[in-house]
């Protein structure tokens, strides 16, 4: 993240002297309200929108501009049982030619009897491919440079069975093309069975327990989820494979302003799994601090513990520790090699209980900044 953006955050968090007079919280609130960043939700607007732009810098993407658009709404204003629905759009463009757009929608209907969750993304990003497994990821001098052209979409409809228990049915689409490959590097992607272009399409079924008080930023509750996705040529996929996802997270309010959050997550695949669909050990949600895509394999397990503290006004901070491992089979997960992760982050409450987050994650021999909307988990 750029020094300009960090300086801006520090000025807001710690104004002194004439700065405090010139940049009073009331004035900043006034500026933010022009962007829709009110600290109160106005259901009469239909969708209560807010926009937050910000510069960033990373070694991979260079200098760029990111924008987060957050909308809060209630499909039925008379529904007092369901939590507020949220629609989040995040986009970026950088000096390296990278650009991307992602969307997340959490919608709650009929006194929380029905839920519709949609996640999607499109991106054109210069990146690297190391290969499968720890052995490949450790060979940094043998990675292949390419531009990832990615399109993903995962809609899911949930129906409540009993209190806090939901059954879901959905679809998963993922298209990835490796473009502009550096021919001076080893031809790793070209050597995969699927080649540079992969299309995966599959049907999924979920069952979960969810009593979180607010999905984008829980203060209390638990979330346990099992998802099975079957990809097959008959469903439009290039290859046939299965994906199993297990997740558990727990949120405990230590006080009115502090929360302890913990999660364990596993992604397990079998069959003819394409290189683009192998689970990753490293992202903006889990194992922060590792280059996304460096470590990938058929099976990945990780866990993290995060302390979240609300400060004065809109400010907050977090700190986390965690670890993860991976392997080509379930039995290989017990090989004893685990990668650590830890870091700290800043939170700015853009909409009621919807944070803009700036995280700095540290891994073994690597680190990274993350600028996103909503908590990591």
Regions found by a protein language model. Give the residues of each.
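C-terminal outer-membrane beta-barrel translocator/porin domains of Gram-negative envelope proteins
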Residues: 23-24, 192-196, 203-311
């Amino acid at each position: 993240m750029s020094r300009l953006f960090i300086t801006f955050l520090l000025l807001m968090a710690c104004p002194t002297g004439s700065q405090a007079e010139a940049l009073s919280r009331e004035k900043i609130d006034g500026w933010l309200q022009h962007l829709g960043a009110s600290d109160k939700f106005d259901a009469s607007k239909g969708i209560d929108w807010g926009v937050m732009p910000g510069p960033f810098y990373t070694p991979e993407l260079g200098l760029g501009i990111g924008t987060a658009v957050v909308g809060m709404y209630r499909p039925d204003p008379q529904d007092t049982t369901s939590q507020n629905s949220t629609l989040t759009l995040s986009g970026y463009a950088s000096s390296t030619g990278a650009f991307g757009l992602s969307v997340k929608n959490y919608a709650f209907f009929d006194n929380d009897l029905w839920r519709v969750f949609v996640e999607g993304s499109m991106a054109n990003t210069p990146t690297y491919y190391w290969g499968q497994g720890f052995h490949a990821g450790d060979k940094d001098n043998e990675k292949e440079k390419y531009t990832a052209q990615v399109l993903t979409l995962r809609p899911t409809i949930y129906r409540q069975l009993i209190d806090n228990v939901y059954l879901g049915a959905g679809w998963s689409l993922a298209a990835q093309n490796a473009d502009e490959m550096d021919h001076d590097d080893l031809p790793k992607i070209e050597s995969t069975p699927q080649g540079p272009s992969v299309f995966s399409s599959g049907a999924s079924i979920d069952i979960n327990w969810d009593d979180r008080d607010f999905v984008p930023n829980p203060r209390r509750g638990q979330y346990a989820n099992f998802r099975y996705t079957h990809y097959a040529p008959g469903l439009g996929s290039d290859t046939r494979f299965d994906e199993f996802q297990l997740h558990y997270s727990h949120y405990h309010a230590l006080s009115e302003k502090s929360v302890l959050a913990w999660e364990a997550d596993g992604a397990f695949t079998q069959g003819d799994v394409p290189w683009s669909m192998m689970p990753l050990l490293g992202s903006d949600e889990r194992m922060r601090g590792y280059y996304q895509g460096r470590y990938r394999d058929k099976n990945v397990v990780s866990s993290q513990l995060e302390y979240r503290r609300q400060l004065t006004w809109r400010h907050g901070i977090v700190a986390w520790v965690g670890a993860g491992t991976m392997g080509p089979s379930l039995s290989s997960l017990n090989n004893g090699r685990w990668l650590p992760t830890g870091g700290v982050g800043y939170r700015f409450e853009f909409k009621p209980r919807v944070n803009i987050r700036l995280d700095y994650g540290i891994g073994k021999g690597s680190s990274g900044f993350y600028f996103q909307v909503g908590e990591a988990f």
